[in-house]
């Protein structure tokens, strides 16, 4: 018996709804605003078949290039062979969500702007570069009432 290679083949678990998340789509999904240039994640909603992406694009991140009343155009870079092709997808809003990939960066930009303004008001230089975790500070262990013990491995013995 031959194998079927349909458009939604092998998506039994990929497109299923989460536990206790079945039913109608929440209104907040439709009230989100998408603008050209926004970064979005593709996550297909199995209860809405219209405007659903192919299984390859599940979990991919792209940039919005077009917005219509019922769908959003997204540009994805797809690796084909040894090159990337720009793929343009037209997806319904149920199948995308705003990406959090730039969230930490934008928060850091705001924090740096606040630090820079505060330093300028005080007239001091400010360090804005992130520093890697430094080694722990040195400590002194007292041996008073705490005699060091010499440890040795237990010899391996076999009794057969």
From Swiss-Prot:
GO terms for molecular function: structural constituent of ribosome. GO terms for cellular component: cytosol; cytosolic large ribosomal subunit. InterPro entries: Ribosomal_eL21, Ribosomal_eL21_CS, Ribosomal_eL21_sf, Translation_prot_SH3-like_sf. Keywords: Cytoplasm, Isopeptide bond, Ribonucleoprotein, Ribosomal protein, Ubl conjugation. It is found in: Cytoplasm. Disulfide bonds: none annotated. There is a cross-link at residue 32 (Glycyl lysine isopeptide (Lys-Gly) (interchain with G-Cter in ubiquitin)). GO terms for biological process: cytoplasmic translation. It holds the Pfam family Ribosomal_L21e. Component of the large ribosomal subunit (LSU). Mature yeast ribosomes consist of a small (40S) and a large (60S) subunit. The 40S small subunit contains 1 molecule of ribosomal RNA (18S rRNA) and 33 different proteins (encoded by 57 genes). The large 60S subunit contains 3 rRNA molecules (25S, 5.8S and 5S rRNA) and 46 different proteins (encoded by 81 genes). Present with 66400 molecules/cell in log phase SD medium. There are 2 genes for eL21 in yeast. Component of the ribosome, a large ribonucleoprotein complex responsible for the synthesis of proteins in the cell. The small ribosomal subunit (SSU) binds messenger RNAs (mRNAs) and translates the encoded message by selecting cognate aminoacyl-transfer RNA (tRNA) molecules. The large subunit (LSU) contains the ribosomal catalytic site termed the peptidyl transferase center (PTC), which catalyzes the formation of peptide bonds, thereby polymerizing the amino acids delivered by tRNAs into a polypeptide chain. Belongs to the eukaryotic ribosomal protein eL21 family. This is Large ribosomal subunit protein eL21B. It comes from Saccharomyces cerevisiae (strain ATCC 204508 / S288c).
């Amino acid at each position: 018996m031959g194998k079927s290679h349909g458009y939604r083949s092998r998506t039994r678990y990929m497109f299923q709804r989460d536990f206790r998340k079945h039913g109608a789509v929440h209104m907040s999904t439709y009230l989100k605003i998408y603008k050209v240039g926004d970064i979005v994640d593709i996550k297909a909603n199995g209860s809405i078949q219209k405007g659903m992406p192919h299984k390859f694009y599940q979990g991919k991140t792209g940039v919005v290039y077009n917005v219509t009343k019922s769908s959003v155009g997204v540009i994805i870079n797809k690796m084909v062979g040894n090159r990337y092709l720009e793929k343009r997808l037209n997806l319904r809003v149920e199948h995308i969500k705003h990406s959090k990939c730039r969230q930490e960066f934008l928060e850091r930009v705001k924090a740096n702007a606040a630090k820079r303004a505060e330093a300028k008001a005080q007239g001091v230089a400010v360090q804005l570069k992130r520093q890697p975790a430094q080694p722990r500070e040195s400590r002194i262990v007292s041996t008073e009432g705490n005699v060091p013990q010499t440890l040795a491995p237990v010899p391996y013995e076999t009794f057969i």
